[in-house]
Amino acid sequence: MRRPPRSTLFPYTTLFRSYWDFVNVSGRQVPGLCVAFSRDGIHWVKHSKAPLLQGAYGDPTQPPLSAESRSEPPTRPAISDVIDLMWDPRRDCFVIYSKTWIDAPDGRRFWKRAIIRTESKDFIHWSMPQLIIVPDDGDSGQIHGASVFYLHGVYLAMLQRLDFGGFDRGGTGNMPAELALSRDGIHWQRSFQDKMFLPVTGKGDTFDAGCLWTSSTPIHLPGETRFYYGAYPGWNSDLVNDASGIGLATLPRDRFVAIEPADGIAQVTLKPIQLGNVNRLTFNADATGGEVRVELLTAEGYRVAGFTQDHSIAITGDSLQHPLKWKGKTMENLTAGRYQLRVHLNNARLFALTLGQ
């Protein structure tokens, strides 16, 4: 990871690395979080203290007694061997989303994989890991990792959905990626569990047929977002002889999800927003086979004269930034205040709305 913009941490360091490793501590090998620093991405200096957070993995046993836990992590759950690092611009800190293990119904450890979160202001002192995402009734398997990035004021995650039962019994071992959303990076909405954001076929011997390893650093370009991922054919692949590699998936800009009619025609009324200083509205929409019209309502839900559906100039075609227009009116004619946008969809899909000044 590059040094965050305007950060005064480590002024001569430009790159930060977090990784899982085993460290000799008093004659025994202790796994956990290690970090390193670099100016050029080639020559790295490991931090003298390691591990900064002790990790855990092992056989399915009951947790040890408190008096016998000195060699264990200070608290459970602990980090494990999948570590995704991000810079949180809202909290102004580093954040790691790591794999962890949750207990089985009978209390034994290392039953299923889940996700914990830890943060740091200086990349060295990390908070106590917090359990944030666990498999629920909608999951057929486990959650192996979470690659999180911040975009347009929200946190998005690609959850690695590993198809194994408890203690890795049953299942295919396939691992596609699910899209999840959060407003704070801690509490997550999983509205797309039934449709994978990055799917796998689970068939054939192509390098990305079975398991995808996602990244928390997608590349955002003016017209598209690029997602690079590591992959191999399956969980039990022969990593020496089977194909593996780095893949690329592309997405038109901001087209993560869409609102579209279930039966041709629909309307969506958005929450009231302040439009006093907004002089331009654009829609990211595909109306190739239909049209989109937009009208304004007051915050109380009543139509605004001159900005009704009848006055709206229809949006047609496919574009990342359709301008919203009305006959004889512009946003500058609008009295300052809070308004609702009512979007009328006719065989069209709406992906995003942008407010401009």
Language-model features, listed with the residues they occupy:
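Short, small-residue-biased leader/transition segments that mark boundaries at the very start
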Residues: 1-4, 8-15
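Carbohydrate-active catalytic/glycan-binding domains of CAZyme proteins
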Residues: 11-357
